[in-house]
Amino acid sequence: MKLNNSLLLLIVAIIASSNAAETFSNFQVTNSEASSPCVTTPVELKVNTCQSACDSILNVLPVTGSTSKFTFNQFGAQDTKCAATPTSSNEFTCVDGKSKVAIGTTTYSVVCVPDKTNSSESDSSDSTRIGASFALFALALLSMLAL
């Protein structure tokens, strides 16, 4: 029974360490309107920044409690500071780094760019996870041998 519990704990720990949440720092947007400058060249939007993109003034705000779910706001052409109430807004979630979101009458394609400043998502994160998984496996093996 103790062996089964140790194996179960090992499996849960490995799964938990490999499923660390990915955070996103900015987005690249395009849309399907032929007249838009975003059709061939994606425009990068930064979180919490008022920017002009795709012939619109846009603002992407994070939703409280989530690092992959955001609110995409569209403002009027004159509102260069995104100070007024958005003309339209919609929430989207980054799934596998890509998403589509409808804002008003326009559908945007959004490519979510991972936040590389997050220490758990650095370029060496895969090797770190492998090392952590190996350490957990060794710890579980030692605890089983001690039984």
Swiss-Prot record:
Lipidated residues (GPI-like-anchor amidated asparagine): N118
One GO location term (cellular component): lamellar body
Location within or outside the cell: Cell membrane
Segments crossing the lipid bilayer: none
Topological type in the membrane: Lipid-anchor; GPI-anchor
Record's comment on post-translational modification: The GPI-like-anchor contains a phosphoceramide group, rather than a phosphatidyl group.
Main location group: membrane
Protein name: Ponticulin-like protein C5
Organism field: Dictyostelium discoideum (Social amoeba)
Gene that specifies this protein: ponC5
